[in-house]
Amino acid sequence: MSLYGVYDPDNVFARILRRDLPSHRVYEDDDVLAFLDAYPQAPGHTLIIPKHGQARNFLELDDRAITPLFSCAKRLMKVIVAELEPVGVQMLQCNGGDGGQSVFHFHIHLVPRWKGQPLGLHAQTPGDAAELAKLAERLRRRVETMSFEQEWWT
């Protein structure tokens, strides 16, 4: 699919938002939903999506959604680093089929990385549902207990 087209209200992420499909939710508020990727590239591979609008990609995203999405991404990256101790975290956002996008509902990937692990766009095999459920619970607990106080430079 190209950058331009009609939003499909039955895409997998829209169905997850409506709870028509199960997901391993890590975080949710009025504006965003974060859940573990069912086809993870690495343990803790998290997807963050807007709960409002019908943006297929970043070009279509309402400006008011940007701050909640990227604030959530920063918080969850801190959670992933604290809980899983990766040596890096890949933050990825693809636009259009030729840009690597496979689900046409705006989303951000957070992929923990460890030394020697190859970079990739999409995993080919689903994660183990029981392991995903355990990991989602660990990350939810960390979200609930972690401080996110921001210090600003002066």
Each language-model region and where it sits:
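HIT superfamily nucleotide-processing domains
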Residues: 1-154
